[in-house]
């Protein structure tokens, strides 16, 4: 009986650790997603500002401490590519989050099952 209890305890600890790792991954995913969402909004604002400009307007790009003159068409293309990339990353993060949340639900069920089995073993030992 003691060996079975120890085995259940070990399984429970393993599952709880796995659940905690998944929860950390979910938190990290949310943090990265928040950063990408902010960048997406910033790039959309830049895109709108670039659309307002005349074709002859001077556009400068900040590279380190220096402002470098950039062609308007090139600037628009760069911003569009950046928005596409960020959008793709957001979709990827959403898909990853869905998988993590499903995995989290499965681990929670396993932990609950193991806890119930442990509770069932303990009263039996107390009566004996």
Regions found by a protein language model. Give the residues of each.
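Short, charge-rich amphipathic alpha-helices with coiled-coil/heptad character
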Residues: 1-27
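Extended, EK/Q-rich alpha-helical coiled-coil segments that serve as long dimerization/scaffolding arms
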Residues: 1-5, 75, 124-128
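Extended, charged amphipathic alpha-helical "stalk" segments
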Residues: 13, 25, 31-38, 67, ...
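Long, charged amphipathic alpha-helices with heptad-repeat/coiled-coil character
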Residues: 26-33, 90-107
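Short coil/loop "hinge" linkers that interrupt or connect long alpha-helical coiled-coils or helical hairpins
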Residues: 48-75, 125
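Mid-chain, well-packed structural core segment of small domains
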Residues: 65-93
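Non-transmembrane, heptad-repeat alpha-helical coiled-coil rod segments
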Residues: 96-128
């Amino acid at each position: 009986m003691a060996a079975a209890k120890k085995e259940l305890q070990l399984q429970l600890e393993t599952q709880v650790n796995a659940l905690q790792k998944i929860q950390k991954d979910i938190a990290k995913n949310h943090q990265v997603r928040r950063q990408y969402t902010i960048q997406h909004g910033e790039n959309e604002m830049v895109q709108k500002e670039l659309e307002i400009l005349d074709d002859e307007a001077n556009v400068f790009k900040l590279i380190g401490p220096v402002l470098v003159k950039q062609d308007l068409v090139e600037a628009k293309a760069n911003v569009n590519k950046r928005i596409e990339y960020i959008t793709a990353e957001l979709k990827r993060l959403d898909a990853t989050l869905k998988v993590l949340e499903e995995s989290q639900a499965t681990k929670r069920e396993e932990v609950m099952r193991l806890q119930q089995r442990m509770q069932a073993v303990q009263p039996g030992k107390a009566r004996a």
